[in-house]
Amino acid sequence: MKHIGIAAITAEGAALVYRNICKMAALRLGDYCHPEISLHSFSRHVHANEDRLSVWADLILESSHKLKASGADFMICAANSTHEVYKLVEKSLPIPWLHIADGVSHRARAQNLQSLLLLGTQYTINSGIYDQVLSVSNISGARR
């Protein structure tokens, strides 16, 4: 079983994804069974009001190295906006970072969905984080 690393950009997102991983694993593997999970978090004030791209890129790189050192095979991040730096750091990461839009696209294809409604912050809506991944899968997205 793979060791999952969670880049905890927001406490809410990290807690939700951790809880869901454990719940889904229990359904598939049995009660109290889940993969090894490591979480790395920065205090939100470090990145909340800074130049997003440069600060986020540095934070994700640092987090990925710490998660790898903990034994993680790959990392995930439940914060939509942070994925804007994915292309900037992808090749420099010591472990794979699973893109949030790839997960959404995979799930949509599995359910034969052809269009999705994206709800989020203005930053996420305007960033185009989902556009390329969804278009490759021929899934259209509306924004609100």
How would you label these PLM feature ranges?
Residues 1-144:
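Non-catalytic structural scaffold of enzyme domains
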